[in-house]
């Protein structure tokens, strides 16, 4: 069974269709009667004055109302005017945009001819100023990067130089220590061969510990005595005189002892400080005689001790 709602919808559609057809017929009848009425008015007016002929463009078409023709003409004119205005506006915008793009590349001086306004000129100047500022900042950043790279390269170069100097210094110190150890070992071998204790006509070679101890006592005895007779020193330490002289010369060459051996067979021990004082005296006086040097040495060099040290046994 069909729902009542369907019947209601169909009835509403039929009523709407009837109203639409009725209204359409009324409009058609009114449009047909209007030309007849317009023709009667000029005929009656022709008895008084002859009507002027109409222009071709003002003649209306058959069956077309004047009002509708005028409305269409106005709409067409408005559309044409609107299209022209839109075309002009788009053309003006394109020209302005192209001119702005061209003005960005041109210097500001080219716009001083008065063809553009002050406001636009100010905007262009601001754009140019911002562009110049960006370029200056970019150049400053590049220069800063270049300087930082240069400083970093210099730092690395300086670090490398210091590292090489440190390595060279360590190598020199290592070689000096090795050479010192080698000299000490050679000196020990010489002392071991030379120092002989003569006891009851039988010579015995000293041990390593005895040799070091004997050498220390030998040097200490000379330093405390200041002036020693080489023959007496040789007899006291149990060495031959020539061996004693050779040992003292070796110690002088090594820098262990400082002093002089005179022509009377004596060794005079002089400390490095006393040697510096004598050298300073000679340098200050210029030319010095032996007598003056001997007199000055009495005050510059401490001769002997109140209690001389005992010679090594």
Curated annotation (Swiss-Prot):
Region of interest called Disordered, as start-end residue ranges on this chain: 40-88, 130-185
Membrane topology: Single-pass membrane protein
Modified residues (Phosphoserine): 73, 113
Pfam families found in the cross-reference section: DDRGK
Main localization category: endoplasmic reticulum
Motif (UFM1-interacting motif (UFIM)): 194-208
Cytoplasmic-side segments: 29-313
Domain of life of the organism encoding this protein: Eukaryota
Chain spans, region Mediates interaction with UFL1: 215-313
Region Mediates interaction with CDK5RAP3, residue ranges: 1-113
GO biological process, one term: cartilage development
GO cellular component assignments: endoplasmic reticulum; endoplasmic reticulum membrane
Entries under SUPFAM superfamilies matching the protein: Winged helix' DNA-binding domain (SSF46785)
Sequence intervals crossing the membrane: 1-28
GO molecular function: ubiquitin-like protein ligase binding; UFM1-modified protein reader activity
Cross-link (Glycyl lysine isopeptide (Lys-Gly) (interchain with G-Cter in UFM1)): 266
Biased composition (Low complexity): 73-87
Record's keyword terms, sorted: Endoplasmic reticulum, Isopeptide bond, Membrane, Phosphoprotein, Transmembrane, Transmembrane helix, Ubl conjugation, Ubl conjugation pathway
Region entry Mediates interaction with TRIP4, spans: 117-215
Domain notes from UniProt: The UFM1-interacting motif (UFIM) specifically recognizes and binds ufmylated RPL26/uL24, resulting in stable association between the 60S ribosome and the UREL complex.
Family: Belongs to the DDRGK1 family.
Quaternary structure, from the entry: Component of the UFM1 ribosome E3 ligase (UREL) complex, composed of UFL1, DDRGK1 and CDK5RAP3. Interacts with (unphosphorylated) ERN1/IRE1-alpha; interaction is dependent on UFM1 and takes place in response to endoplasmic reticulum stress, regulating ERN1/IRE1-alpha stability. Interacts with NFKBIA. Interacts with SOX9.
Role according to the record: Component of the UFM1 ribosome E3 ligase (UREL) complex, a multiprotein complex that catalyzes ufmylation of endoplasmic reticulum-docked proteins. The UREL complex plays a key role in ribosome recycling by mediating mono-ufmylation of the RPL26/uL24 subunit of the 60S ribosome following ribosome dissociation: ufmylation weakens the junction between post-termination 60S subunits and SEC61 translocons, promoting release and recycling of the large ribosomal subunit from the endoplasmic reticulum membrane.
Name of the protein this chain belongs to: DDRGK domain-containing protein 1
Organism from which the protein derives: Bos taurus
Underlying gene: DDRGK1
